[in-house]
From Swiss-Prot:
Protein name: UPF0285 protein MmarC5_0962
InterPro entries: ATPase_NBD (IPR043129), Methan_mark_12 (IPR016735)
Homology family: Belongs to the UPF0285 family.
Species: Methanococcus maripaludis (strain C5 / ATCC BAA-1333)
NCBIfam families from the UniProt entry: methan_mark_12
Taxonomic superkingdom: Archaea
């Protein structure tokens, strides 16, 4: 059995080829590269396309579907629209359309939004959107890797999304625009709201630079800002303050969900969550009274492949989300 998982992230598209539960290869294409090259031609370097049994696909916000759905049944790529989602480059759209126009079987993974009925109704009442599809994939990877039925998953990268899993189902959480900051994205504070009202900046532009990049004022584009801030932690005061502030913000978000999970299992993921120098996970552990673990790199793509594999093995729901395939 050969499956492929797709993670549509802020900085690019990551794909995982898995055969009989074993990861065979992982590759990443920057969004700018996808605009010039075929994703399927790149994938063909790693696997015979005719041998793929199923692909698990993440795309954008995933707010147009509420089940894990056969790509043939999905309209408008599974989104309501592409507004208010951060910087749009177009690479993910090309990948999705290539996959849909091919004959490769695929399912589209939804995001977590108010129409996903498996979540606690209070979170649906509070927030229109909680997470994009790859966060479900990351959660499923964590669920399969560590075997916990109850845990908090915090994915820290360009943005931060923190989710709570209870009794093997996604219970709720906090979206990138609500709670903790990431490197690029974050919630809007008073100054940004005033700038939006004054028409100095759009809400989407504000969200896209409301992360700790606002501390360093060193925006280098979607792909390079992260490295610029993290690599200068020890020799630049603003970069140190930015990372320390991010750690505080994420720790606060995790702790706010801790009372809902007596098992106190916390799993960190994302490029910043697994960053080793500075060691972000150790910094967060100092603020958390719980069992803090770190998930493997490229966890979203691997999780998407795990979802595809288990669907082929007959699973009818993933973390409480129904499968329509």
């Amino acid at each position: 059995m050969i499956v492929v998982g797709i993670d549509h992230g802020t900085s690019g598209i990551t794909a995982c080829v898995m055969e009989n539960k074993t990861v065979k290869s992982i590759f990443k294409m920057k969004r700018t590269e996808i605009n010039e090259n075929s994703f399927l031609k790149e994938l063909e370097k790693h696997v015979n396309l005719n041998d793929i049994d199923l692909m698990g696909v993440c795309y954008s916000m995933g707010d147009g579907i509420d089940n894990i759905t056969d790509i043939k049944k999905v309209d408008n790529r599974g989104v309501i629209n592409l507004e208010g989602i951060g910087k749009k480059v177009g690479g993910g759209t090309r990948v999705y359309d290539e996959i849909k126009s091919s004959n490769i079987p695929a399912v589209v993974i939804p995001g977590l939004h108010k129409d996903v009925k498996s979540m606690d109704e209070r979170f649906n009442a509070l927030f229109s959107h909680i997470a994009s599809p790859e966060k479900i994939s990351i959660c499923y990877n964590a669920y399969k890797t560590f075997g916990f039925e109850n845990f908090i998953l915090s994915d820290i990268s360009s943005n931060t999304v923190t989710l709570l899993i209870k009794n093997g189902k996604i219970f709720g959480g906090f979206d990138a625009c609500v709670g903790a900051v990431g490197i690029l994205h974050g919630p809007l504070d008073l100054e940004l709201i005033r700038n939006i009202d004054a028409k100095k900046i759009t809400a989407n532009e504000a969200f896209s630079k409301a992360g700790v990049v606002k501390v360093t004022e060193s925006y280098k584009g979607v792909e390079d800002t992260k490295f610029e801030i993290m690599s200068n932690y020890k020799n630049n005061e603003k970069c140190k303050l930015a990372v320390d502030s991010l750690v505080l913000s994420v720790s606060m978000e995790i702790n706010s969900l801790m009372f809902l999970t007596p098992d106190k299992n916390v799993i960190l993921a994302g490029s910043i969550g697994i960053w080793e120098n500075p060691n972000v996970s150790e910094m967060i552990k100092e603020n958390i009274d719980g069992n803090v673990l770190v998930l493997n790199e490229e966890s979203g793509a691997i999780g998407s492949a795990m979802i595809a594999e288990d669907i082929l093995n007959g699973k009818k729901d993933i973390l409480g989300i129904p499968v329509d395939f």
